[in-house]
Amino acid sequence: MDEDILVVNGSQQGIDLICKALVGKNTVVLAEGPSYSVALHCFQCAGARVVTVPLLADGPDMDAIRAVVDPTPIDFYYTMTNFQCPSNVYWSERKRRQLLALAQEN
């Protein structure tokens, strides 16, 4: 619906608004390393604990994600599946499906 769309000036403004609305002192954010440093800084300034997992040639290290998610419930996963910044990695279809399955389990 139209009321569910928010137009912003750029990614930094969108990330800032997400932080203001969804991120707090006890928020756990999962992200790939390396990742967009401005976003990670914004999450940390909002009080989140950012946990990073290695990024491989075809997407994130799924074993590392499972190792984080099993003992630590995460609130959200900050990622870019197409042309990830700064690595320009493009996730494989297999990694996308694995992440979806993991999200549905948790």
Regions found by a protein language model. Give the residues of each.
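Conserved core of the PLP fold type I
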Residues: M1-N106
